[in-house]
Amino acid sequence: MPISSHSHSGQFCLHAQGKLEDVIQEAIQQGFQSFSFTEHTPRDRVEDLYPEELHLQPEDLFKTFDEYVNEARRLKQNYGDQINILIGAETEYIRPESVELLKSLNTKYNLDYFVGSVHHVNSIPIDFSPELWQKALQHVGNNPEQLFIDYFEHQYDLMQRLHPLVIGHFDLICLFAPEDAKEVFKNSKSVWELIQRNIKYAVSYGGIFEINTSAFRKGWKTAYPQQRLLELMVEQGAQLTLSDDSHGPHQVGLNYHLAKSYLDKCGITSLCMIEKGPDGNGTVVKNVTVDNVWSKFVGTNGITNT
């Protein structure tokens, strides 16, 4: 029975579609055993708004997040007898000060967990568009190695100070990287030393790396992380989970058949499923076999939706 540890809805994310209730209903229809709500955390500065949010103010984002948590709790109450539902959030690490905001949100809402993601390098978005990726590159003197280094330094800072249970799309920095930059990524000793350090640190505190299938719909031949990284994680004894990173009901379980082939190719036979702890306190992590994750999966979505 499938799982997803990372998702969004158009109700609370402007670049997604559909209502949160539509998302969980689709997950139930497809036979999911466990599904996590993880809308984006709000940002507290006007300069950090995305182009799609320029008509808003930071206080609007905080109001939306509050509405999200309340709706997620309602849905858990209504559907919790049909599916394991967790209520978390995906981090917005824009600068070091962002971590204090994340901690305050967790204190206020007692979230089940964070998906620890980095979408910005030196406060510039790196996964919103190729143009903004290039802007981030220009900020570091058009030195792709430095851009990769800064990304993994940000990721390390986030992990050290927040200990997110799930590490989101570990190599997102590569999404819009042109071929010459990808060669730098592949061959840079400095970059790979940071990668190994980050993986080792996550393993040390019990962090879980997601196999994120959204990379397939964005044109990759693998999920996040790419194969060399995934093999390194396995070598270091990392825990792995599965995420569709769906942005609406039309993407629930999308490309999971490709993920199964990818995991089989990499020799991965088990994944982690996150559940609430005894009496509803905290979370517990259970190991499930890859074959069990795909049993009773009724994938109703297409292959190439974006």
Swiss-Prot record:
Its EC number is 3.1.3.15. GO terms for biological process: L-histidine biosynthetic process. Pathway: Amino-acid biosynthesis; L-histidine biosynthesis; L-histidine from 5-phospho-alpha-D-ribose 1-diphosphate: step 8/9. It catalyses: L-histidinol phosphate + H2O = L-histidinol + phosphate. One of its GO terms (cellular component) is cytosol. Transmembrane segments: none annotated. It holds the Pfam family PHP. It comes from the Eukaryota. Keywords: Amino-acid biosynthesis, Histidine biosynthesis, Hydrolase. GO terms for molecular function: histidinol-phosphatase activity. The keyword Amino-acid biosynthesis applies. Disulfide bonds: none annotated. Belongs to the PHP hydrolase family. HisK subfamily. NCBIfam families: hisJ_fam. This is Probable histidinol-phosphatase.
